[in-house]
């Protein structure tokens, strides 16, 4: 029986990779998504991120370009894409996100046209089909940088 928490991470930038390493280190089953196939190929092949030199991504962190793979059946889903891509990513992922899903938003910023926070943007997009009324959506924020989290120093999640 596998008691690992399954976590999908939307976004393979420095935040996504730093959190993937940290969550994996703490015993969770992690899958990272990017919409860019070449990026996923490079991460899978090298097990490193170009902006986090010298930090190795464990072999058991999974990578995919498929939204259904990263979102379906996960205990927790993290949104770690740039703020400019939050709305489009939420819209694209919506069919694969079950109602009641725990979602953690780690993107920072305000949407210029609506002045919504990223968490509000995610909720707005997910609510458009009327089937995501019970999504548990939280924001994770604080005075940290992806590079610090990637170093795994003084952090326990």
Question: Where in this protein do the model-derived segments appear?
Answer:
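Short, well-ordered alpha-helix to beta-strand connector turns
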Residues: 27, 60-61, 74, 100
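Conserved short-loop catalytic and cofactor-binding motifs
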Residues: 31, 58, 106, 110
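Short, solvent-exposed coil/turn segments
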Residues: 56-57, 142
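NAD(P)+-binding Rossmann beta1-loop-alpha1 motif at the extreme N-terminus of oxidoreductases
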Residues: 1-56, 62-65, 92
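Residues in flexible loops and secondary-structure boundaries
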Residues: 41, 51, 60, 71-72, ...
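A generic secondary-structure signal marking the coil-to-beta-strand transition
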Residues: 59-60, 136
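Conserved small/polar residues in nucleotide/adenosyl-binding loops
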Residues: 155-157
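Rossmann-like NAD(P)(H) cofactor-binding subdomain of soluble oxidoreductases
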Residues: 67, 72, 76-152
């Amino acid at each position: 029986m596998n008691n690992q928490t399954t976590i999908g991470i939307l976004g393979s930038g420095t935040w996504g990779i730093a959190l993937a390493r940290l969550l994996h280190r703490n015993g969770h089953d992690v899958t990272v998504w990017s919409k860019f196939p070449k990026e996923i190929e490079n991460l899978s092949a090298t097990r490193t991120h170009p902006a986090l030199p010298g930090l190795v991504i464990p072999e058991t962190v999974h990578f995919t370009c498929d939204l259904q793979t990263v979102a379906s059946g996960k205990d927790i889903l993290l949104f770690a894409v740039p703020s400019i891509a939050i709305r489009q990513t939420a819209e694209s992922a919506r069919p694969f996100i079950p109602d009641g899903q725990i979602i953690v938003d780690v993107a920072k910023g305000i949407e210029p046209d609506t002045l919504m926070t990223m968490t509000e943007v995610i909720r707005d997009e997910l609510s458009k089909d009327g089937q995501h009324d019970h999504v548990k959506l939280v924001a994770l924020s604080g005075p940290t940088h992806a590079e610090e989290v990637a170093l795994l120093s003084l952090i326990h999640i």
